[in-house]
Amino acid sequence: MQPTLSDSDQILVNTHIYDFSSPTTGDIVVFDPVQSKRKQAIKRVIGLPGEKITLRDGMLYVNGDIRKEPYLKGLPHYLGLDEFSCQLEINQYFLLGDNRSHSTDSRAFGPIMENQIAGKALLRYWPVKRAVYRIK
C-alpha cells in the first residue's frame, strides 16, 4: 500500500462500520484473503458489486469510464502490467494496492466477498511523525 501505508505503520481499524453500511470506492479495508497464508491484508476498494473493472493502456476504467486516482501521487500506476478485466457479481469487491506494480491484490486472487472484509482503516497513529487522522 505504499506510499499511503508502510509495513511498519500502526493503524486503527473500525471493525463495525460495515455492520451499518457497505464499503465504498476508495475505502482502505482490512480483509481475510482466502488464498493467502497471511491472516489479514490491507488494500483499497476499487470496484463495487455490479461494476466492470478494466486495466488497459496504463489506465483504470470502471464501467468504461477512466477512474481518477489522486492518491497514487504520480506513481507509475500500471507500467508493464498486462491488460485485465473483471465483472463483479453481487457482494463482490475489487481491491488494489496503491503500489500497483508490486502489489498482490484482486488481479492475482480475484474479487473478494463482502463477508471477507474485517473493517475500514481510519487513522495511522504510528510512527508519530506520519500520524494522520484520516487515511485517504
Named regions from a protein language model:
Residues 2-136:
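Soluble "head" domains of membrane/secretory-pathway proteins
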